[in-house]
Amino acid sequence: MTKWKRANPNGTRDYLFEECTLIEEVEQKLRRTFLERGYEEIRTPTIEFYDVFAFQSRPIDEEKMYKFFDEKGRIIVLRPDMTIPLARVVGTQRCDTPLKVTYSGNVFRANESLAGKYNEIVQSGIEVIGIDNVRAEIECVISVIQSLQKLKVQSFTIEIGQVQLYKCIVKKLSIHEEEEKVLRTYIESKNYASLSNFIRDKKLDRCDETVKLLEKLPRLFGNLEVIEEAEKLASSNEMKMAITRVKEIYEAIEKLGYGSYISIDLGMIQHLDYYTGVIFKGYIYEIGEEIVSGGRYDELIGNFGEMLPAVGLAVQVNQIVKALQEQQEPYERKRIDIMIHYELNRLAEAERLRNLFQKDGKKVALSLFSNLNDTFQFARKNQIVTVVEAKSESLVEYVWKEKWVVQKEGETSCVTFKLR
């Protein structure tokens, strides 16, 4: 029964000290940026009913969910996604739209043990609900670019894709569900040879414009030239409209001066089936890890109430922290400036003195030791150069100068002591 008591479950880890501080700072900077842009905060439970994620299209594999039972025997899951619970809130609470919301929280997914992915991650994100025009996507992209800039993330790019275009191709070529799952992997992984074999085995006409577009899809990544190529092969108004939407977003973001942060990838297909239109993925060049994901999901909220158009983007906080650790100087947590050693009958005075120093921007802590020498040893070990002793009759300040030297003493009041 005690075999695993010293270990972490697969896909999880402990975060200590400086890394915890950095995670908190990233979350808060993201939150501040989103709130400044007019987003309102929503928080949902860490646990949800299984039924919340088990609607018809089953966007999240059942095997990836952590499941258990509540006191009534109902199936509960640790939330594997943030967008679906938000859709539940909006659909059931009948919120006024348009609505801009932001969130931050932990997401849990059971990945394969050797996949190199964490099963618990932190996501901060935004959703624009109730708007079906291109302004919603533009707002989301601008918000995320500005937030990454404020975090000083270097060399990132946000790719713009269009799952609607892919769905139009699949529908027109009458590709069945099981075949589509295989086809999707070929396109996403840009496996040109397997895609060519798929077209051959399906006996699809390579002279057909839609088949040409399908075969070219994994190669359609880059700038606006990609759009021009796709437009030439689009064989329906629906395809053309899907391509035009990507073009409008790209041009709008480029005009703002953010062109270096965006690119187009029409061969990008999100793994979550609830996306219905434009989709996004963000990467950092040096790391190659996904730091942003999202897209348009116009049919998701309808599973919980009124059908409402929506777009969202999630920022992977853990990956941002990893990038910052690699791109910047090693992060050092702020050291304690002053340690206050006190006798128990002087606790109130010690706490007042701590507050006074803190107002001056100092990081101050009360000693946990009853013996002054133990406080001195702790201070030296932790590179604290100032110790203040609150004795019964007076206050004494010690400073480390190859040894502990009395800097000042004699006052009984913390106010007059600090002013000296």
Swiss-Prot record:
User: Coiled-coil annotation: which residues?
Assistant: none
Q: Where are the transmembrane segments?
A: none
A UniProt-annotated Pfam family: tRNA-synt_His
Question: What does the UniProt entry say about where the protein is found?
Answer: Cytoplasm
- Main location as per UniProt: cytoplasm
Involved pathway(s): Amino-acid biosynthesis; L-histidine biosynthesis; L-histidine from 5-phospho-alpha-D-ribose 1-diphosphate: step 1/9
Which biological process annotations from GO are given for this protein? histidyl-tRNA aminoacylation; L-histidine biosynthetic process
What keywords are assigned to this protein? Amino-acid biosynthesis, Cytoplasm, Histidine biosynthesis
GO cellular component terms given for this protein: cytoplasm
One term of GO molecular function: catalytic activity, acting on a protein
Oligomeric state and interaction partners are given as:
Heteromultimer composed of HisG and HisZ subunits.
Record function comment: Required for the first step of histidine biosynthesis. May allow the feedback regulation of ATP phosphoribosyltransferase activity by histidine.
Q: Family assignment?
A: Belongs to the class-II aminoacyl-tRNA synthetase family. HisZ subfamily.
Among PANTHER family, the record links this protein to: ATP PHOSPHORIBOSYLTRANSFERASE REGULATORY SUBUNIT (PTHR43707:SF6), HISTIDYL-TRNA SYNTHETASE (PTHR43707)
Q: What else is known?
A: This function is generally fulfilled by the C-terminal part of HisG, which is missing in some bacteria such as this one.
Q: What is this protein called?
A: ATP phosphoribosyltransferase regulatory subunit
Q: Which organism is it from?
A: Bacillus cereus (strain AH820)
